[in-house]
Amino acid sequence: MTLEYIYIFIFFWGAFFISCLLIFLSYFLVYQESDIEKNSAYECGFQPFEDTRSKFNVRYYLIAILFMIFDLEIMYLFPWSISISTGSFFGVWAIFLFLIILTVGFIYEWQKGALEWD
């Protein structure tokens, strides 16, 4: 291993060791006994009026996935835009094909009604 990467190696293993140590300590040092106050009603002393688990519409998850897809698109476009001056013609066509695939996917989602909130 060259000396250029030794600091990254040390940082990685140090972070790994510290996180494992904290997880290990949290399991053994925490007070895990449940008492009456923790299991009692929480809505101003009354019994709960409804189930605490609220149901989310599936469309929220769909919008979150679409956001992640287009967020990843931006993540790929920023490095490409910085390296465009040193890139070749192949790089331009590769990103053009990437954008076309994403655009076709977006049009497909739009026509299937994935973006409609009926």
Swiss-Prot record:
Keyword Transcription among UniProt keywords: no
UniProt entry keywords in alphabetical sequence: Electron transport, Membrane, Mitochondrion, NAD, Respiratory chain, Translocase, Transmembrane, Transmembrane helix, Transport, Ubiquinone
Membrane topology, from the record: Multi-pass membrane protein
Residue stretches spanning the membrane: 5-25, 62-82, 87-107
Catalytic activity: a ubiquinone + NADH + 5 H(+)(in) = a ubiquinol + NAD(+) + 4 H(+)(out)
InterPro entries: NAD(P)H_OxRDtase_bac/plastid, NADH_UbQ/plastoQ_OxRdtase_su3, NDAH_ubi_oxred_su3_sf
Keyword Hydrolase set for record: no
UniProt EC number: 7.1.1.2
A Pfam entry, by short name: Oxidored_q4
Cellular component, GO, one term: NADH dehydrogenase complex
Gene Ontology molecular-function annotations: NADH dehydrogenase (ubiquinone) activity
Subcellular location: Mitochondrion membrane
PANTHER family: NADH-UBIQUINONE OXIDOREDUCTASE CHAIN 3
Family membership noted in the UniProt record: Belongs to the complex I subunit 3 family.
Task performed by this protein: Core subunit of the mitochondrial membrane respiratory chain NADH dehydrogenase (Complex I) that is believed to belong to the minimal assembly required for catalysis. Complex I functions in the transfer of electrons from NADH to the respiratory chain. The immediate electron acceptor for the enzyme is believed to be ubiquinone.
Protein name, per record: NADH-ubiquinone oxidoreductase chain 3
Organism field: Acanthamoeba castellanii (Amoeba)
Gene: ND3
